[in-house]
Amino acid sequence: MKSKVRLLLVSLLFVAPVSVYAQKDSVWLKCPLDEAIIVPPPKNVMKFDEPDLCVGLVSVPDTTVKACITGRVSNVIQNEDEKWDVVFYYRDYYFWYSGLSKVIVKKNDNLKVSQPLGYITPGDKLELSIFKFETPLDPTRFLDCKVVMKTD
């Protein structure tokens, strides 16, 4: 009986810290647009070695783009198409927002969850990419948006 109890205690000492450490690294993200619809990529797109793990978000009533997590702005870029990109980071994660029509943050600004960082034109798509260091991650695994559009 004592050996079973001892084995149980030893296993708890090793298993509990590992599971707590694994949970510590997961990231849960608030949706950057209220009432957003996640738009899947088109079916007939070219496939490359690296999957494009970007997700598109559309929201008719909401055009204010908000931070999905607390972080710090590392870059604000205007593209050739006059749209803006905002990149910010939290721990080892980088969040890349593309397609903003107006930006209200600047490099090195600290962001809080749900803090506005810019706007999109009504009907336009906001693209979100997530990276852990340089490795792209699937945003749908972490994003808390309510509706996913079906493409049948």
Locations of the language-model features?
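Intrinsically disordered, low-complexity acidic/polar segments
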Residues: 80, 97, 106, 137-139, ...
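Bacterial Sec-dependent N-terminal signal peptides
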Residues: 1-26
